[in-house]
Amino acid sequence: MSTGGCCVNSPAASSVRYLTAEDLLNLNHAITGDPMVRDIHLLHSAVRRPRLLLFGEPQFPTLAGKAAALMESLAYHHLFVDGNKRTAVQAVTHFLARNGQHFSYDAARDADFVLAVARGEYDTAAIAAWIEERMSANG
């Protein structure tokens, strides 16, 4: 099923600017001072997940969906020794900024949600809806 141009948040796949494994390592280093990867395969999986295709169609067609897939992969799978949830939030912030969007995260307001993501209490669609509520165009 094609999503066509139905959604404002549906970028052309070639125009999306994704984070790399190096970007994630740098974010975790800035947070913890010493990025220690628990599982390098999970790191590469987290980087690839927002780009997934299912029967030739993006599994996550919106920027919020791609950001949610990234957040879930980082927070839930605990691929770093420390700073997974903080890295997940920063990864979403940087991914959206690279793609012309501002992410409004307030630790006092939003920390419980991120903790719940880390415990596996929300699916990717719910995470995407939460991110969408906190997104606005840069500028």
Label the model's feature ranges.
Residues M1-G139:
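FIC/Doc superfamily catalytic core
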